[in-house]
Amino acid sequence: MGGETVKSWTAARQSGSVRGMAESGVNPTAAALLGLLHEGPMTGGQLMAAAERRLAPYWSMTRSQVYRELPVLADKGLVRLGKPGPRMSQPYAITAAGKRTFSRWLAEDPGRDTIRNPIALRIAFGQLHSASQLKSLQAAANEYHTEALARVREQAKNARKEGDTYDASALEFAVAYHKAALSWLKSAPVSS
C-alpha cells in the first residue's frame, strides 16, 4: 500500500485535487474521530478524552469541534448512534461505510502543515513590546514547552512499553517539536 499511497498523493497534487475538503469527504477532525472509533463505541465525552489522551500532543481538537462533527458523521452514515446512557449521553460506533471512508482518508495526501505559533507571532512584532513583556513571554513559553516535553516523553515511553510503535512515533514528533521550540526560545531576542 505504501507505494500506491505515494503515487495517489503525487497524482492528486498534479491534478490539482488537493485542496480544502479531502476526496474522502471528511476533514481531519472527522477523520480523527473515525480513527478513534476503531477502538470501539464512545460518547462525545469519551471521544474528547480519547483525543486528549492520544492525539493532543500533536493534533488539537476542541469539544465544540467534536460535538459539531458527530451529527454530520451520523447523517453521512459513517457512524451510528447507540442507545442513550446516563445523563442522555449517546455512544457512537463506526459503521462499515465509516471504516471505508477512513481508509480512503488515510490514503490521501495529508496536505501541508499549518504552522500557527502564538509565541512566534508575538516575537515577530517584538519591536512593539517592552523588554519586560518579551522576557515574560519567553519565560511563560519556556515553562509551557518544558512541562509539555516532559509529558510527551513519558507518553512516548509508555507507548513503546506497550508495543504501540505507531503511537510512539507520533508522540516522538511532539517530543521533537517541544525540543525545537525550547531551542528556538533560547535564541529569540528578549529585548526591543
Positions of predicted regions on the chain:
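Residue-level recognition of alpha-helical structural elements
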Residues: 62, 112, 134, 163-167
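Basic helix-turn-helix/winged-helix DNA-binding cores
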Residues: 3-114
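Amphipathic alpha-helical coiled-coil segments
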Residues: 178-192
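Amphipathic alpha-helical dimerization/coiled-coil segments
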Residues: 103-150
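Amphipathic, well-ordered alpha-helical segments in soluble domains
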Residues: 43, 47, 69, 144, ...
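Acidic interhelical loop/turn segments
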Residues: 153-171
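Hydrophobic alpha-helical segments that form the core
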Residues: 169-181
